[in-house]
Amino acid sequence: MELTLKDAKGALEVSEATFGREFNEALVHQVVVAYAAGARQGTKAQKTRSEVAGGGKKPWRQKGTGRARAGTIRSPIWRSGGATFAAKPQNHSQKVNKKMYRGAIKSILSELIRQERLIVVEKFGVDEPKTKQLAAKLKEMDLNDVLIVTKEVDENLFLASRNLHKVDVRDVQGIDPVSLIAFEKVLMTADAVKQLEEVLS
């Protein structure tokens, strides 16, 4: 199959297996959820009765006071005591094998092409790290909510994009399922498309 180049005459020959597959909604959902779960910190924590400071001394003797027996002032039923079932840091990550991950990326790319949300250009960049320069270029192309993907990290392009809302710049190694579906349009250079095809094959 061929992808039309927006900034030049001609087209780019790409693999049907990578850019022309059917959209697998269940797979994409599973991979996106797993990716988001892996980004969770899971640092919630509370203290049990053994972890709360103090409470080493028995508050009163075992027998003879008429009161209920007590061994520590940090018992969960006491004010300032530890939690009965204290929350602990958790690992929320889910296992996704490489085949599933690559399949989801291919599925998303194919759907972006069908929805005409993937734009391929021969080259894309700015001469200097100026936001105004990049903003003007994107306005020319009628793009304001876009993920820009290049073959390698372009320092000027990255710095120019940092102050633009809804614009992100990644290299091929930096893309993920969440970023691909988060933007209205995805702008890719021809070099990036070929490298991505190589990585996914």
Curated annotation (Swiss-Prot):
UniProt KW keywords: Ribonucleoprotein, Ribosomal protein, RNA-binding, rRNA-binding
Domain of life: Bacteria
A Pfam match: Ribosomal_L4
One CC-aspect GO term: ribosome
One of the GO BP terms on file: translation
UniProt KW Membrane keyword: no
Gene Ontology terms, MF aspect: rRNA binding; structural constituent of ribosome
Residues in the signal sequence: none
Region described as Disordered: 43-69
Functional note: One of the primary rRNA binding proteins, this protein initially binds near the 5'-end of the 23S rRNA. It is important during the early stages of 50S assembly. It makes multiple contacts with different domains of the 23S rRNA in the assembled 50S subunit and ribosome. Forms part of the polypeptide exit tunnel.
HAMAP family to which the protein is assigned, alphabetical: Ribosomal_uL4_B (MF_01328_B)
Subunit structure: Part of the 50S ribosomal subunit.
NCBIfam families the record matches: rplD_bact
Family: Belongs to the universal ribosomal protein uL4 family.
This protein's name: Large ribosomal subunit protein uL4
